[in-house]
Swiss-Prot record:
Subunit and partners: Binds TFIIA and TFIIB.
Domain of life the protein comes from: Eukaryota
PANTHER family named in the record: TATA-BOX BINDING PROTEIN (PTHR10126)
Subcellular location: Cytoplasm; Nucleus
One Gene Ontology cellular component annotation held by this UniProt entry: male germ cell nucleus
Gene Ontology molecular function terms on file: RNA polymerase II core promoter sequence-specific DNA binding; RNA polymerase II general transcription initiation factor activity
Pfam families in the record: TBP
Function statement: Part of a specialized transcription system that mediates the transcription of most ribosomal proteins through the 5'-TCT-3' motif which is a core promoter element at these genes. Seems to also mediate the transcription of NF1. Does not bind the TATA box.
Knockout-associated phenotype: Significantly reduced NF1 levels.
InterPro entries membership: TBP, TBP-like, TBP_dom_sf
Protein name: TATA box-binding protein-like 1
Organism of this sequence: Mus musculus (Mouse)
CDD domains xref list: TLF
Membership in a protein family: Belongs to the TBP family.
């Protein structure tokens, strides 16, 4: 087994966060009274609205800015955001779906081996930081991709990046480094 051999790694996307604007003022009280699956947080000035399909939660501000979380793909996030805009239109608001952007993608990937974290950190010092007293994972940052990886000794890697492509590229880039520090099977 070598680092160059093609190993199929399953990257499971667990959360996609997106943001969009409605280009109109939203009356939060009206949304809270007439909308479905709504929680009104008056003290912080926002409304939480949940959709069942796709399963997303939206945070709505009166300025018209909406943040959607919980989607499992970029396409699902856009579909859910459009459904949310449509439901606001049905409540009587002059919603125009604009400035849609995926801002964060969270994914999990399992390596087919365990990793020696102290050795990995020593070999990749400027990018990797490991504080076992504070957190059981190595924090590895790839500035060019704006991605952060949490690498656990079990071989599980949690990747946070700006889009799905950056997450996949980050896993491809980190594989040879974690392969060097894998635990030998007895």
């Amino acid at each position: 087994m070598d680092a160059d051999s093609d190993v199929a790694l399953d990257i499971l996307i667990t959360n996609v966060v997106c943001v969009f604007r409605t280009r109109c003022h939203l009356n939060l009280r009206k949304i809270a009274l007439e909308g479905a699956n709504v929680i009104y947080k008056r003290d912080v000035g926002k409304v939480l609205m949940k959709l069942r399909k796709p399963r997303i939660t939206a945070t709505i501000w009166s300025s018209g800015k909406i943040i959607c979380t919980g989607a499992t793909s970029e396409e699902e996030a856009k579909f859910g955001a459009r459904r949310l805009a449509r439901s606001l239109q049905k409540l009587g608001f002059q919603v125009i779906f604009t400035d849609f952007k995926v801002v964060n993608v969270l994914a999990v990937c399992n390596m087919p081996f365990e990793i020696r974290l102290p050795e990995f950190t020593k070999n990749n010092r400027p990018h990797a930081s490991y504080e076992p007293e504070l957190h059981p994972a190595v924090c590895y940052r790839i500035k060019s991709l704006r991605a952060t990886l949490q690498i656990f000794s079990t071989g599980s890697i949690t990747v946070t990046g700006p889009n799905v492509k950056a997450v996949a590229t980050a896993v491809e880039q980190i594989y040879p480094f974690v392969f060097e520090s894998r635990k030998e099977i007895l």
